[in-house]
From Swiss-Prot:
EC code(s) of this entry: 3.4.11.18
Alphabetical list of Gene3D superfamilies matching this protein: Creatinase/methionine aminopeptidase superfamily (3.90.230.10), Winged helix-like DNA-binding domain superfamily/Winged helix DNA-binding domain (1.10.10.10)
Compartment annotation: Cytoplasm
UniProt similarity note: Belongs to the peptidase M24A family. Methionine aminopeptidase eukaryotic type 2 subfamily.
Pfam families: Peptidase_M24
Protein name: Methionine aminopeptidase 2-1
Function: Cotranslationally removes the N-terminal methionine from nascent proteins. The N-terminal methionine is often cleaved when the second residue in the primary sequence is small and uncharged (Met-Ala-, Cys, Gly, Pro, Ser, Thr, or Val).
Lineage, broadest ranks: Eukaryota, Fungi, Dikarya, Ascomycota, Pezizomycotina
Cellular component annotations (GO), alphabetically ordered: cytoplasm
Reaction(s) the record says it catalyses: Release of N-terminal amino acids, preferentially methionine, from peptides and arylamides
Residues reported in the UniProt entry to bind a divalent metal cation 1: 231, 242, 440
Organism of derivation: Pyrenophora tritici-repentis (strain Pt-1C-BFP) (Wheat tan spot fungus)
Length: 459
């Protein structure tokens, strides 16, 4: 989920060297290979025999009085009990893995930097806080969220074909996340335990980010010549995995998708402890803008979008205070041990500068505003519902409307937005007729390595 640059938009909850070598220690596993099939053999050795069978016999006298051993028949092997994910995926991961560890992401060695600078006191405090969050459940929660994302997006990729409606696609993703995390989000506070980290983004063509279908709007159907960006997040106990991909049925857009995917992988390769963000941004832009696209007989350069960025992720907060632009920039910020980053890139055939469009993508609580300014009872009640069910997570109208007892909330929401207690987020668009692609992964900067937690066989 992209973060708008601070000079263009007030930040809300939604809102290294180029030739460094990257060593892959542990390649990614596909969802199918990392938990879709699981079985157990109970009380069996490899050959299916019990040990006692080989040691025990029955003494039988022969006609000449000699003793002869009669071997017992070997027990037949029991059949393997197989648990297989359904299509669409609806079996919770807790059932599928049965207390087995969730798959790792892609493990990559840190690149040693020789241009380190002394951290300030503020940076040290932030560093300590990040490491303290890495408790015993940290990797378990993150790997579970990542595996949910892989399985749900695999299903989404199979149905994201021309003719599918955006409403159906969004519902399939939303319901898949809820089913696999085991949290429907209907009971008060349940969505804060695990589920959607932000509204599922389904952006077509010149719409770059922050669009999702809502009830009452005109239905949008995917067409053969569309470029669709699918951006959704999964959280487990507030540990957020943010990952996105682009699909296009028409091969004319292949170079656009290849440019953005290569740029994202470049950013992931450059990311690491003490990596300079300005170096990462420059490397991303260089790769992205080395590509061209042939559209309607014209050769069009792929441009890196200038005013939306990658970002670090905090617990229950999709956007932290660090940003990773896709264009060359001046900043002294560095990545630090314990940081979690959403490394994403957007490439456009248009102006590569996004602006707010009409409509509302989602809402997010502004923690810096006190509810003491509220006097309207309906607004107070709605704010209480938001705090209890979403906290600092960004949510869409359809997520709010499915909660029991929520109805006729529009006046209260308008009051909350006008008072600054809740922020609303509009779709972000380039010029009409342009095409934008996006790819994104979440990377954990662990003390001894970086783990691209959302990596899969697909991208």
């Amino acid at each position: 989920m992209g973060s708008k640059s601070p000079e263009d938009h007030r930040q809300g909850p939604d809102g290294g060297s180029a030739d460094a070598a990257v060593t892959i220690i542990n390649p990614p596993k596909s969802a199918a290979a990392s938990g879709l099939l699981q079985g157990m053999l109970e009380g069996q050795d490899e050959d299916g025999d019990d040990d006692d069978d080989e040691k025990t016999g029955i003494n039988v006298k022969t006609y000449d009085g000699a003793k002869k051993k009669r071997k017992r028949n070997k027990k037949k092997s029991k059949k393997v009990a197989v648990i297989q994910q359904t299509f669409p995926p609806r079996i919770p991961l807790a059932t599928l893995f049965d207390n087995q560890p969730y798959p790792e992401g892609q493990i990559v060695d840190h690149v040693v930097k020789d241009d380190n600078i002394k951290r300030t006191t503020t940076e040290e405090l932030r560093h300590v806080a990040a490491l303290n969050d890495m408790d015993d459940d940290f990797l378990k929660d993150y790997r579970k969220a990542a595996e949910v994302h892989r399985q749900v997006r695999h299903h989404a990729q199979t149905i994201a074909k021309p003719g599918v409606s955006m409403t159906r696609l969004a519902e399939e993703i939303d319901e898949g996340v809820r089913a696999l995390t085991g949290h429907t989000g209907l009971e008060t506070g349940d969505a804060l335990k695990a589920g959607l980290a932000f509204p599922t983004g389904l952006c077509l063509n010149h719409v770059g980010a922050h669009w999702t279908p809502n009830a009452g709007a005109k239905e949008v159907i995917l067409k053969h010549d569309d470029v669709l960006k699918v951006d959704f997040g999964v959280h487990v106990n507030g540990r957020i995995v943010d990952s996105a991909f682009t699909v296009a049925a028409n091969p004319v857009y292949d170079n656009l998708l290849a440019a953005v995917k290569a740029a994202t992988n470049t950013g992931l390769g450059e990311a690491g402890i003490d990596a300079r963000i300005d170096h990462i941004s420059e490397a991303i832009q260089e790769v992205m803008e080395s590509y061209e696209v042939e559209l309607n007989g014209k050769t069009i350069p792929v441009k890196a979008v200038r005013n939306i960025t990658g970002h670090n992720i905090l617990r229950y907060r999709i956007h932290g205070d660090k940003q990773v632009p896709f264009v060359k920039t001046k900043t002294d910020q560095r990545m630090e041990e314990g940081d979690i980053f959403a490394i994403e890139t957007f490439g456009s055939t248009g102006k590569a500068h996004l602006r707010d469009d009409v409509g509302v993508y989602g809402y997010g609580r502004n923690e810096n505003m006190s509810p003491a300014v509220l006097h309207q009872s309906s607004a107070k009640s709605l704010l209480k519902t938001i705090d209890a069910n979403f906290g600092t997570l960004v949510f869409a109208r359809r997520q709010l409307e499915r909660l029991p007892g929520v109805e006729k909330y529009h006046l209260g929401m308008r009051t909350l937005v006008n008072s600054g207690l809740v922020e609303s987020y509009a779709p972000l668009v380039d010029i009409t007729g342009s095409y934008i692609a996006q790819f994104e992964h979440t990377v954990l900067l662990r003390p001894n390595c970086k783990e691209i937690i959302s990596r899969g066989d697909d991208y």
